[in-house]
């Protein structure tokens, strides 16, 4: 049985182009998992195994790989850096115990780095920092360290210092051991020598070593007192303090190097062993009540002897069949075991289990707490489902995914492609919870919903290449919403007599704007039995059912509070269905009186531009109804942060590249809903009516 203290479940995350996938490749090379190094530049990278990833040079799915370093087992997950795929980062962070944040030595803290860092903070994941690409023109390790402090509000603990700059970067100094690691120009990671620290760096190394020890001993009162009295702790004592501080997120051990040139990577791997936590050292996953989603107060203790508790965190369909990636928190799992899916109440037999290496695999007979593995051919499991021992039912804390903000209508070019498309989309929805599909009841069109243009582009591409479904794609549509601005007190009676028993339900109610992000809330203050209590849920159901189709343009309605305060019933003719119909009629009657208003999604946009184009970029964002929030001067350009309506951002990447001669970058994520200006609202409503008229 494997020793859990020697497990490290880690993720590698960063901004697009910070060198994340290359860093992972180097880890695999150094740990003996691959023999020829794949480069993202030439589309041969091991972790980027989808066609779309190899072509675009970005990582879309989180590939999981197992490798070994100094008798420790690493389960490594390479996460995407593009903002449209942050759901993959979020999903990975859910099952990781530690991570490596990769930053570009010249680009520094870029927009997506911030988003991923925030997610990792929320998940309380311990991290190392690796400042990569120090061989690049304009790379500056110390500037990036300052940016980490200023932009991320984090505390980087410098563990290595660079020897040389840009194309003269030859190696690193280990601040703790006072050793210089110098590589030759062969590009081979093993071709290095350990030397004396260069004379011109001795003072700098001592300065950083003192700062490092001061930060470390703050984790141990006795050591701190001894250090203040002039007694230097041993290297092992310092390491123990750094390990504790890293685990508690007090600081982030920070390394430097060049993954592409194979310089500095061994020290990062040693740091994973020395400072990142094992599965037994992180807060155990909370168990929740499946009905309410509230924590029960119990946890999934990380132990091989406890009953099985595992989380399905990713579904993937590949050339070998359907794969369900699971993180085992407690217990053991063997081939042939029967497990309970607590979300469906159904049991499944475990057939084949595999350990993944990007998209290759090793067959397993058994797995245990701490393992991240894939199970082949599970039937009814979705992302976020808990798999457990049938005799010890439990539910792990579920995953919550962001709502899609953009949609496109699609239909197969070939009339016979509908069934094929339906099967393919079904598989893709199971794989990616932020990708949703629905059918327009009036037009029969299939509507695909996602997190951004690139997200949906790639889905259409996968349908074409992987499943052979050619699509006609409509223009992107924005996920507008509706709300109300005024309170209304009203009454509605539903009455139907047609021989025999009829239908009767009378409700007196108030509708008013709810708190932001409250969705729909309902309460009854009826006294005296004018509307019997058993009919209150029917009234609530009637109102809530109508919230999906607002009165302005049929968009879902947000933040509405309904109070039922009186009404009337008939001893024979009243029923739950009569009161539900009354509530639906009341919605149609009163919502137009309540000042209905169209809401549009506002995106948090983060643009990086060379300084000489900043005026053009800001002018363009203003024309897009953007509100500029912040401007920051960096070493290589300017970062502009703005809130911009999603409807104004379609095709923005092309405009930005043209304005900045191809040097601009941007990321955006959903921020909030805001009232549409009246001229925009009128145009949107008119377009919806025109579209509906054609159906």
UniProtKB/Swiss-Prot annotation:
Residues 5-280 form the tr-type G domain. The keyword Nucleotide-binding applies. GTP binds at residues 14-21, 78-82, 132-135. It comes from the Bacteria. Keywords: Cytoplasm, Elongation factor, GTP-binding, Nucleotide-binding, Protein biosynthesis. It is found in: Cytoplasm. GO terms for molecular function: GTP binding; GTPase activity; guanosine tetraphosphate binding; translation elongation factor activity. GO terms for cellular component: cytoplasm. SUPFAM superfamilies: EF-G C-terminal domain-like (SSF54980), P-loop containing nucleoside triphosphate hydrolases (SSF52540), Ribosomal protein S5 domain 2-like (SSF54211), Translation proteins (SSF50447). Its main location: cytoplasm. GO terms for biological process: ribosome disassembly. HAMAP family: EF_G_EF_2_B. Catalyzes the GTP-dependent ribosomal translocation step during translation elongation. During this step, the ribosome changes from the pre-translocational (PRE) to the post-translocational (POST) state as the newly formed A-site-bound peptidyl-tRNA and P-site-bound deacylated tRNA move to the P and E sites, respectively. Catalyzes the coordinated movement of the two tRNA molecules, the mRNA and conformational changes in the ribosome. Belongs to the TRAFAC class translation factor GTPase superfamily. Classic translation factor GTPase family. EF-G/EF-2 subfamily. This is Elongation factor G 2. The gene is fusA2.
């Amino acid at each position: 049985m494997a020793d859990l203290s020697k497990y490290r479940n880690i993720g590698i995350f960063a901004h697009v182009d910070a060198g994340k996938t290359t860093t992972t490749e180097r880890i695999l090379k150094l740990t003996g998992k691959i023999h020829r190094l794949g480069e993202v530049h030439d589309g041969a990278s091991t972790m980027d195994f989808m066609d779309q990833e190899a072509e675009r040079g970005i990582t879309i799915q989180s590939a999981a790989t197992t490798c070994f370093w100094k008798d420790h087992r690493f389960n490594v997950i390479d996460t995407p850096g593009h903002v449209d795929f942050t759901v993959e980062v979020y999903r990975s962070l859910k099952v990781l115990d530690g991570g490596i944040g990769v930053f570009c030595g010249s680009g520094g803290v870029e927009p997506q780095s911030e988003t991923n860092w925030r997610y990792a903070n929320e998940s309380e994941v311990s991290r190392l920092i690796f400042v990569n690409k120090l061989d690049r023109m304009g790379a500056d390790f110390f500037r990036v360290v300052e940016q980490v402090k200023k932009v991320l509000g984090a505390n980087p603990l410098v563990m290595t210092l660079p020897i040389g700059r840009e194309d003269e970067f030859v190696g690193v100094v280990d601040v703790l051991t006072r050793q210089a690691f110098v590589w030759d120009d062969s590009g081979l990671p093993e071709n290095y020598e350990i030397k004396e620290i260069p004379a011109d760096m001795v003072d700098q190394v001592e300065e950083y070593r003192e700062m490092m020890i001061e930060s470390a001993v703050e984790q141990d009162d006795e050591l701190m007192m001894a250090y203040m009295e002039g007694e230097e702790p041993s290297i092992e004592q310092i390491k123990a303090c750094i390990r504790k501080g890293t685990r508690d997120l007090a600081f982030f051990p920070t390394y430097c190097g060049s993954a592409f040139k194979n310089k500095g990577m061994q020290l990062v791997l040693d740091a994973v062993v020395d400072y990142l936590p094992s599965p037994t050292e992180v807060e155990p996953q909370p168990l929740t009540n499946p009905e309410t989603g509230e924590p029960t107060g119990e946890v999934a203790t990380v132990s091989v002897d406890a009953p099985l508790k595992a989380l399905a965190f990713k579904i993937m369909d590949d050339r070998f069949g359907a794969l369900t990636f699971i993180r085992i928190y407690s217990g053991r799992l063997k081939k042939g075991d029967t497990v309970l899916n607590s979300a469906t109440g159904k049991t499944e037999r475990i057939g084949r289990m595999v350990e993944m290496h990007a998209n290759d695999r090793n067959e397993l007979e058994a797995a245990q707490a701490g393992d991240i593995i894939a199970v082949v051919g599970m039937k009814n499991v979705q992302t976020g489902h808990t798999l457990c021992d049938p005799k010890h039912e439990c539910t792990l804390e579920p995953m919550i995914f962001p709502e899609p903000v953009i949609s496109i209508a699609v239909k197969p070019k070939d009339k016979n492609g509908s069934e094929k498309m339906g099967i393919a989309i079904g598989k893709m929805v199971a794989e990616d919870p932020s990708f949703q599909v629905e059918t327009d009841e009036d037009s029969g069109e299939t509507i695909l919903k996602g997190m951004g243009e690139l997200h949906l582009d790639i889905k259409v591409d996968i349908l074409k290449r992987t499943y052979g479904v050619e699509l006609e794609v409509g223009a992107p549509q924005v996920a507008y919403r509706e709300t109300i601005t005024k309170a209304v007190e009203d009454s509605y009676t539903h009455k139907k007599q047609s021989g025999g028993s009829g239908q009767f339900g009378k409700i007196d109610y108030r509708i008013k704007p709810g708190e932001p992000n409250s969705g729909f809330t309902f309460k009854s203050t009826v006294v005296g039995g004018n509307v019997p209590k058993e009919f209150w849920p029917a009234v609530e159901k009637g109102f809530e059912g109508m919230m999906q189709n607002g009165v302005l343009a049929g968009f879902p309605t947000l933040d509405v509070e309904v109070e039922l305060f009186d009404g009337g019933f008939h001893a024979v003719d009243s029923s739950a269905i009569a009161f539900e119909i009354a509530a639906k009629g009341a919605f149609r009657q009163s919502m137009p009186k309540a000042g209905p208003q169209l809401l549009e999604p506002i995106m948090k946009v983060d643009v990086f531009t060379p300084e000489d184009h900043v005026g053009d970029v800001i002018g363009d964002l203003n024309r897009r109804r953007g509100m500029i929030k912040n401007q920051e001067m960096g070493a290589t350009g300017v970062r502009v942060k703005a809130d911009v309506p999603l409807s104004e951002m379609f095709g923005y990447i092309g405009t930005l590249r043209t304005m900045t001669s191809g040097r601009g970058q941007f990321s955006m994520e959903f921020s909030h809903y805001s009232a549409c200006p009246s001229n925009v609202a009128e145009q949107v409503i008119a377009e919806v009516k025109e579209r509906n008229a054609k159906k």
